[in-house]
Amino acid sequence: MISVNDFRTGLTIAVDNGLWQVLDFQHVKPGKGAAFVRSKLRNLRTGSVQEKTFRAGEKVEKAHIENRRMQYLYASGEAHVFMDNGTYEQIELGEKQIERELKFLKENMEVSIMTYQGEVLGVELPNTVELQVTETEPGIKGDTASNVTKPATLETGLVVQVPIFINEGEMLIINTGEGKYVSRA
């Protein structure tokens, strides 16, 4: 059990028959009445975000999430296959389960699989990934006004805004949290 006063971003808790990750929290001390903690939580099973208020000092159960290093192997229809590098055990995750992460996954990529009491919750990506540009308009020489961008389609199908000097075939570093261009690889 953990007190809501000890909340921090990224903490995983078990409340109301659900597993929740704390996205944001705020301690509130009104002029009248008892203090409370207002929090923004994301359900790890469904991905939905909800705001919940707790009384100050209230206790909640801390969920112990296990992260297993795995390698993304391939897609087989709606299923995506991952392999544990130590035990060579393979697991399949459905497209709905990893919908957001699919835009960044490519074969043989190392990821972290989050599990809770044997149940697979999802995929945790590295902060950045290297992806190749498969389609983009050619940059126009002399068009160098500040912060000019153009859309580029990457090898996974993700479309990002990139500077005009980026060409097809180049490797880019993409931030997985925001889905944005960082730099050339």
Swiss-Prot record:
One GO term (biological process): peptide biosynthetic process
Signal peptide as annotated in the record: none
Subcellular location: Cytoplasm
Keyword hit for Cytoplasm: yes
Cysteine disulfide links: none
Alphabetical list of SUPFAM superfamilies matching this protein: Nucleic acid-binding proteins, Translation proteins SH3-like domain
GO CC, any one term: cytoplasm
Subcellular location, principal: cytoplasm
Stored Pfam families: EFP, EFP_N, Elong-fact-P_C
Keywords, alphabetical: Cytoplasm, Elongation factor, Protein biosynthesis
CDD domains: S1_EF-P_repeat_1, S1_EF-P_repeat_2
InterPro entries named in the record: Elong-fact-P_C, NA-bd_OB-fold, Rib_uL2_dom2, Transl_elong_fac_P/YeiP, Transl_elong_KOW-like, Transl_elong_P/YeiP_cen, Transl_elong_P/YeiP_CS, Transl_elongation_fac_P
GO MF annotations, alphabetized: translation elongation factor activity
Lineage: superkingdom: Bacteria
Pathway field: Protein biosynthesis; polypeptide chain elongation
Family: Belongs to the elongation factor P family.
NCBIfam families: efp (TIGR00038), PRK00529.1 (NF001810)
Purpose of the protein: Involved in peptide bond synthesis. Stimulates efficient translation and peptide-bond synthesis on native or reconstituted 70S ribosomes in vitro. Probably functions indirectly by altering the affinity of the ribosome for aminoacyl-tRNA, thus increasing their reactivity as acceptors for peptidyl transferase.
Protein name: Elongation factor P
Organism of derivation: Bacillus anthracis
Lineage start: Bacteria, Bacillati, Bacillota, Bacilli, Bacillales
Name of the gene: efp
